[in-house]
């Protein structure tokens, strides 16, 4: 499935290359600290020292967030529950609510987090390699995109951690949607912190 997801993502990026309109990414790096600040005093209720850990991550991402990469229309939410398969072949992608104009490599960063960890914490290089190979057969990454995959993946994991953290404290008890534990993203971020280049992701 990962190879199919990579190829579909590349096709989506190529198809949108001539789309003339733009939409701001309202959940990019500049939005993360304002999202977190009202939750600072409550974060430690989930884990001791959690607020300070998040603050340190945000400081790193704010200093190191890439600029100048190829941009276009991105989905930004390519999780398995938004992708459909029939007989092993990708048949559809839904939920373009967060689609926007931003770095194309962001979608790959999302997919690395959403598709390439087993048991919620163990990174699967084979899956990542298939994902990136499927993508690059149609749209090869340039050197800057490859080099920034670790920080992009780290940042997108933090984005989802923060939205989960917000929902954890603001979802009504009788809501139909189920809260997702923000702590589940911590091992993913720790993995990306340990990566210094794109080689561990299986980039060829």
Task: Please give the residue ranges for each predicted region.
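Structured catalytic core of nucleotide-sugar glycosyltransferases
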Residues: 1, 33-38, 49, 63, ...
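A cross-family kinase active-site recognition segment
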Residues: 1-49, 69-71, 176-182
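Active-site acidic catalytic loop and adjacent metal/ATP-binding pocket
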Residues: 59-106, 204
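Charged catalytic carboxylate motif
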Residues: 4, 8, 53, 107, ...
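Active-site activation/catalytic loop segments of kinase-like enzymes and analogous catalytic loops
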Residues: 105-140, 154-172
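ATP/Mg2+ or Mg2+-diphosphate-binding catalytic cores
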Residues: 38-40, 160-204
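All-alpha amphipathic helical-bundle segments outside canonical DNA-binding/catalytic cores
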Residues: 141-153
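Generic structural concept
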Residues: 3-6, 40, 55, 75, ...
């Amino acid at each position: 499935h990962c190879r199919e997801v990579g190829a579909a993502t590349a096709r989506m990026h190529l198809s949108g290359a001539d789309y003339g309109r733009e939409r701001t990414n309202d959940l990019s790096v500049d939005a993360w600290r304002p999202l977190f600040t009202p939750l600072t005093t409550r974060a430690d209720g989930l884990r001791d020292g959690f607020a300070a850990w998040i603050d340190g991550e945000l400081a790193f991402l704010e200093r190191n967030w890439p600029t100048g990469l190829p941009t276009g229309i991105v989905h930004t939410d390519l999780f398995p529950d938004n992708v459909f398969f029939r007989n092993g072949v990708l048949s559809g992608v839904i939920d373009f609510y967060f689609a926007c104009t931003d770095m194309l490599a962001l979608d790959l960063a999302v997919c690395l987090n959403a598709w390439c960890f087993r048991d919620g914490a163990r990174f699967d290089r084979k899956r990542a390699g298939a994902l990136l190979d499927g993508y690059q057969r149609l749209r090869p990454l340039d050197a800057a995109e490859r080099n920034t995959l670790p920080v992009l993946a780290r940042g997108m994991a933090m984005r989802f951690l923060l939205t989960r953290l917000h929902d954890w404290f603001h979802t009504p008890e009788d809501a139909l949607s189920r809260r997702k534990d923000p702590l589940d993203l911590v091992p993913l971020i720790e993995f990306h912190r340990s990566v210094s280049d794109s080689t561990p992701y299986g980039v060829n």
